[in-house]
Amino acid sequence: GAKYFIKNSHLSLTSKLILEDLVEFKPKKIILEIGFGSGENLLKSAKMNPDVLYLGADPFLNTNAKCIKAILNYNIKNIMIWPDDIRKIIEFFPSNIFSEIKILFPDPWPKFKHKNRRLIQDNFLISLYNVLKTNGIITLATDHFIMKSWILEIFQNNSGFQWTAETADDWRIKPIHYVATKYEQKAIYENRDPHWFIFKKIKKI
């Protein structure tokens, strides 16, 4: 059945359990979604791609409970849940394990004095680079103008990633395989246009 892990102070033990299950599953590829919210994309992706393993990470109890309930109701067997901050276990993963990492609508922390609370930071990007396969992609979405600039600034600081956009439509139009989440629909209703950024991991220059 579905794999999910409760908070555990022994992080090395918990990540060891996760890694053992990753090996046991023998998936075609592994995709990480950070901050899955209501789980719309996570659930749809897993149902459409049963040979792909999805690891969802979200620190909020309510979202975890709803998502785990849906996983069990639909008998989805290719989702694992880390119900906490991904930064607590990111260093435990082997290098080059994820084919894709999704970060949809992270908290923008718009005030300048709170900028260090934003998930996207130089050090965190280094961690993501290490666990992402070469030519793997990071997909980010945001509806906040400050966060749009911040994402581009942080990624431009790291020569290991290449922004894939060639035209404005590449970041204005949602990738075809993503579903509209409740948060995204609310943003559009309130006239906040979501922007979609895709960065590919390349060898550092």
Feature names for model-found ranges:
Residues I120-T134:
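A short glycine-rich, Lys/Arg-flanked "PGG" loop and its adjoining helix->strand segment in the class I
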Residues E91-E100, F105:
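A short acidic, Gly/Pro-enriched loop at the edge of an enzyme's catalytic core
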Residues G1-I30, E40-K47, K69-S95:
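S-adenosyl-L-methionine
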Residues E153, N158-I205:
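Class I S-adenosyl-L-methionine
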Residues F60:
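Conserved SAM/SAH-binding beta-strand->alpha-helix loop
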Residues G35-S38:
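Class I SAM-dependent methyltransferase "Motif I" SAM/SAH-binding loop
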